[in-house]
């Protein structure tokens, strides 16, 4: 069918074929209706919005609304807008040579109207794919009306020997050139107020005015805007009359569960087959990584209004894999597993993606990142082992008493960053109470994940102030808390 349509090369052939042109909003609506009826996923690859954002977006499309996606950074706003391309017809005809994708049955540009008047049914047409019907502009303070809508082109006027009174001297901007397309303006509040005002009539009436030319152009467009909440973007805001002309404003959000967050990270992380084959990641490590982002969104050191992007988990996961991969390369090994101490390798991925409040600035970004990792461990620990109370009446009755006794008897225990897997495992196996604790409380835990769990016990005891942990040049040293205190006196 598509090949047959593409064989149609003139207006006359198009008329005889029975082709019926539709507005872009009707295209989106009709194709969405068909997808919903067939039970096919509409916004495939976007996770966590199935019961919240996506139903609202579908309602907006069915209502033929222009849309504003409002949410913090890293909430898949632009991804959703790009996914709307899949709801367009695969190919549509335009008048060949038209700058603004003129519909052969409803031409709006001077060029297309004159060409059809001259050639009639012989007017050439061409077919454009839906992938070409998406235009995107990042709103920046330097964007001008000429960029978006158009301006008089003096070079064109000189070449064609036309006066400035002739509308053929107009050079169309991005919006007219995106006629019959989805047009996305990202970070709308960053657009200067006077530029936002220029969008009023385009959204409502279809009128555009360029340097005194009142050009009546009923542009056929689907506008999608993305914006951060105004209280975060101190750079600007959306002017009220423009808000009034946007049909639906849809609020996005971060993943609500670890499972959804894991799915997003796994989908978006850029790993090659060498990395995935060389590095094994325990399931608990994946959950712990996602928990760090959840902790960051609640942290007193981080500005909640700015949000913590899903990109933080994605880049942190890539760094985590690379930390383990580097160790394997140094040791001449073809395979290794992620360790809890490898999580220190994700600190660079965290520090650049969180906006600190005053208290966080005082602590420093790297220290805050370490706090977040510690908070995630503290949150996870009680899910696997008995909760550690601040005050325990009988220390001997504690499930962790044997572990603490082991450390009290030892001068120190070191886990080196680049130790081989054999060395790492032998070191942890030397602490027999760790094995006993796992056998008692997690007897069915996967064997290949057991060493990560052993290390989690040590880090958990540190977070609950039962052991001390110090960074040494090439790794971490764990000690009995009281002996560490006495040594510092």
Q: What spans do the regions from the language model cover?
A:
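Charged, amphipathic alpha-helical linker segments immediately N-terminal to NTP-binding catalytic cores
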Residues: 2-43, 142-145
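Conserved C-terminal "switch" segment of AAA+ ATPases
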Residues: 3, 17-31, 159, 233-237, ...
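AAA+ ATPase "lid" subdomain C-terminal helix
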Residues: 63-67, 294-302, 314-335, 349, ...
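Conserved lysine of the Walker
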Residues: 77
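Hydrophobic positions on the alpha1 helix immediately C-terminal to the Walker A/P-loop
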Residues: 80, 84
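C-terminal engagement/docking regions of AAA+ P-loop ATPases
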Residues: 305, 325-489
């Amino acid at each position: 069918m598509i090949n047959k349509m593409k064989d149609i090369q003139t207006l006359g052939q198009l008329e005889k074929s029975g082709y019926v042109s539709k507005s872009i909003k009707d295209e989106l609506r009709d194709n969405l209706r068909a997808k919903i009826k067939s039970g096919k996923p509409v916004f495939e690859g976007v996770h966590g919005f199935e019961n919240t954002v996506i139903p609202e977006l579908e309602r907006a499309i069915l209502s033929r609304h222009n849309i504003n996606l409002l949410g913090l950074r890293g909430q898949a706003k632009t991804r959703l807008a790009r996914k709307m391309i899949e709801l367009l017809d695969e190919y549509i005809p335009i008048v060949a040579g038209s700058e603004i994708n003129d519909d052969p049955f409803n031409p709006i540009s001077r060029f297309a109207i004159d060409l059809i008047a001259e050639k009639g049914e012989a007017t050439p047409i061409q077919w454009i794919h839906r992938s070409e019907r998406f235009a995107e502009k990042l709103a920046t303070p330097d964007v001008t009306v000429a960029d978006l809508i158009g301006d008089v082109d003096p070079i064109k006027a000189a070449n064609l020997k036309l006066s400035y009174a002739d509308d053929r001297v107009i050079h169309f901007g991005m919006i007219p050139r995106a006629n019959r397309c989805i047009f996305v303006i990202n970070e709308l509040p960053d657009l200067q107020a006077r530029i936002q005002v220029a969008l009023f009539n385009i959204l409502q009436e279809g009128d555009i005015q360029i340097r005194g030319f009142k050009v009546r152009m009923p542009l056929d467009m689907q506008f999608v805007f993305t914006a951060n909440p105004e209280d975060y973007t101190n750079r600007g805001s959306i002017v009220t009359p423009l808000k009034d002309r946007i049909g639906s404003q849809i609020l996005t959000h971060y993943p609500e569960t670890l499972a959804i967050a894991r799915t997003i990270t796994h989908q978006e992380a850029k790993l090659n087959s060498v990395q995935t084959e060389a590095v094994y990641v325990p399931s608990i490590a994946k959950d712990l990584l996602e928990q760090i982002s959840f902790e960051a969104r609640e942290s007193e050191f981080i500005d909640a209004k700015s949000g913590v992007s899903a990109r933080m988990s994605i880049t942190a996961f890539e760094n985590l894999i690379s930390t383990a991969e580097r160790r394997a390369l140094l040791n001449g090994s073809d395979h290794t597993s992620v360790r809890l101490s490898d999580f220190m390798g994700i600190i660079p991925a965290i520090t650049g993606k969180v906006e600190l409040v005053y208290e966080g600035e005082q602590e420093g970004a790297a220290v805050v990142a370490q706090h977040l990792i510690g908070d995630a461990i503290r949150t996870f620990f009680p899910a696997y082992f008995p909760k550690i109370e601040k005050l325990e009446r009988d220390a001997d009755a504690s499930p962790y008493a044997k572990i603490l006794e082991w450390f009290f008897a030892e001068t120190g225990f070191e886990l080196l960053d680049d130790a081989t897997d054999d060395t790492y495992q032998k070191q942890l196996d030397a602490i027999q109470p760790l094995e006993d604790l796992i056998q008692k409380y997690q007897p069915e835990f996967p064997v290949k994940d057991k060493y990560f769990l052993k290390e989690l016990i040590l880090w958990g005891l540190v977070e609950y102030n039962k052991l001390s942990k110090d960074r040494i040049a090439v790794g971490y040293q764990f000690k009995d808390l009281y002996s560490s205190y006495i040594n510092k006196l």
